[in-house]
């Protein structure tokens, strides 16, 4: 099915589009298998932040341009002494900020993977909430081959997903795994023919959009809290505070302060 995606904002190295409640962020560097630069990542951070704040967006899809690659990680040609060097000549590892943003956005983020999801590209797949893989998808880590590694979500959280033994295999041997192997180890949620991957992804998005956004927000925060320590707890606590602010009980405290009177909290139930 052909869809008319609406361009929400123009970028140099990514696309940011919208269709019926779905925001789609596409890494647009197919000539290098959608490897990212500091600029690519900065643009993705901006797009994801806009999707987070947009009340018309219910689900976010992350993908790569073309059928050959989702993302092949950091562009090694941009790698300098202390990180990946952008136009400002400052070495950065700002993809770590993007990983955290994807985790804390209170909306489901789905990776739509076609072709290679390698290195930092596989880590982006890992931090997304769900993954729809085309049958030509290839996953793997290359860090130890090129003098790099991801000691955060790319290893610790990966081990939670596929198990410690498998995660060590993935990192120590730097092998590549096809879509079926990724499905078998729990790295993706489903595998579909390449020509159906967008249709299936949109279907999953539409199914998700039938459900309570507040419930989904808390479920994401709860599952993140299990792996993200105090930062994860902060996310869930912040969501709880936001929900509390919408209650009459919280509004009574606020209004009493503004009206310079004592709050009447006795009117509210004390549930067991």
UniProtKB/Swiss-Prot annotation:
Which positions does UniProt annotate for hydrogencarbonate binding? 141-143
InterPro entries, per the entry = ClpP/crotonase-like_dom_sf, DHNA-CoA_synthase_MenB, Enoyl-CoA_hyd/isom_CS, Enoyl-CoA_hydra/iso, Enoyl-CoA_hydra_C
**Kind of enzyme, top EC level?**
lyase
The cofactor(s) it depends on are: hydrogencarbonate
Looking at the UniProt record, the site noted as Important for catalysis sits at 84, 245
Q: Name one GO biological process term.
A: menaquinone biosynthetic process
GO molecular function annotation: 1,4-dihydroxy-2-naphthoyl-CoA synthase activity
* Family to which the UniProt record says this protein belongs: Belongs to the enoyl-CoA hydratase/isomerase family. MenB subfamily.
The task this protein performs is described as:
Converts o-succinylbenzoyl-CoA (OSB-CoA) to 1,4-dihydroxy-2-naphthoyl-CoA (DHNA-CoA).
**Protein name (Swiss-Prot/TrEMBL):** 1,4-dihydroxy-2-naphthoyl-CoA synthase
Species for this entry = Staphylococcus epidermidis (strain ATCC 12228 / FDA PCI 1200)
Q: Which gene encodes it?
A: menB
């Amino acid at each position: 099915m052909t869809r008319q995606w609406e361009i929400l904002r123009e970028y140099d190295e990514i696309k940011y589009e919208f269709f019926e409640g779905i925001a789609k962020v596409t890494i647009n560097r197919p000539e290098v298998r959608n490897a990212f630069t500091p600029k690519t990542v900065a643009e993705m951070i901006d797009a994801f932040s806009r999707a987070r704040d947009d009340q018309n967006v219910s689900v976010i899809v992350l993908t790569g341009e073309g059928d050959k690659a989702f993302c092949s990680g950091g562009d090694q040609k941009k790698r300098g002494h202390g990180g990946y060097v952008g136009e400002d000549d400052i070495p950065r590892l700002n993809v770590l900020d993007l990983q955290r943003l994807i985790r804390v956005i209170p909306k489901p983020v789905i990776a739509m993977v076609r072709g290679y999801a390698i290195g930092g590209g596989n880590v982006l797949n890992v931090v997304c909430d769900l993954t729809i893989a085309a049958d030509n998808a290839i996953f793997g880590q290359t860090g130890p081959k090129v003098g790099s590694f991801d000691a955060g979500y790319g290893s610790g959280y990966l081990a939670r997903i596929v198990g410690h033994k498998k995660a060590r295999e993935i990192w120590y041997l730097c092998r590549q795994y096809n879509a079926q192997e990724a499905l078998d180890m729990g790295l993706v949620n489903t595998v579909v023919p390449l020509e159906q991957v967008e249709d299936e992804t949109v279907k999953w998005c539409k199914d998700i959009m039938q459900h309570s956004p507040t419930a989904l927000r808390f479920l994401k925060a709860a599952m993140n809290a299990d792996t993200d320590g105090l930062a994860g707890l902060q996310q869930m606590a912040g969501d709880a505070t936001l929900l509390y602010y919408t209650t009459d009980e919280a509004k009574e405290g606020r209004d009493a302060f503004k009206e310079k009177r004592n709050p009447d909290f006795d009117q509210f139930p004390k549930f067991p």
